């Protein structure tokens, strides 16, 4: 039975989503044991890693705000069905996905402890890194810095 809920509305990036939400909880004297993250699907892993950086004892419940499937149609990537209100166009979606791998990778240019230090360590599977390298050849102009 939920009496009160709070929504952080000031942030403009994933890092501030985390720090501002934690600040809000602190201001309200709320000791959170569980946090539900509802975020753009493309940024779910990074958001969770951001919370883990600041408090590894909080149980993070990741809830993607949408689910979509990308298919090949007429030799181009497209959404299988896209009736999601406000959904990115396919190029922006690819750009968001392609931008996440370098951010999640815990190296000197990533966002983890061995890089910029914005998030907790994330172990990116080798097959994901291999797929990313392959896709960079096709979508180099869509990799966000």
Regions found by a protein language model. Give the residues of each.
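Short beta->alpha junction loops
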Residues: 5-15
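Active-site-proximal alpha-helix that buttresses catalytic centers in soluble enzyme cores
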Residues: 16-23
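Extended hydrophobic blocks
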Residues: 23-34, 38-145
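Short acidic capping loops at alpha-helix termini that bridge into adjacent secondary structure
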Residues: 2-5, 32-34
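Conserved beta-strand segments of alpha/beta enzyme cores
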Residues: 3-6, 59-61
């Amino acid at each position: 039975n939920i009496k009160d809920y709070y929504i952080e509305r000031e942030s403009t990036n994933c890092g501030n989503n985390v720090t501002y939400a934690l600040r809000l909880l602190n201001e309200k004297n709320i000791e959170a044991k569980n946090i539900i993250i509802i975020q753009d699907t493309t940024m779910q892993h990074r958001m969770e890693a951001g919370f883990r950086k600041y408090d590894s004892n909080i149980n993070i419940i990741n809830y993607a705000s949408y689910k979509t499937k990308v298919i090949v149609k007429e030799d181009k990537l497209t959404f299988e069905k896209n009736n999601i209100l406000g959904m990115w166009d396919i190029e922006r979606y690819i750009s968001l996905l392609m931008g996440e791998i370098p951010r999640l990778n815990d190296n000197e240019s990533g966002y983890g402890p061995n890089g910029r230090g914005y998030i907790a360590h994330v172990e990116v599977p080798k097959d994901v890194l291999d797929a990313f390298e392959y896709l960079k050849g096709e979508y180099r102009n869509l990799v966000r810095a």
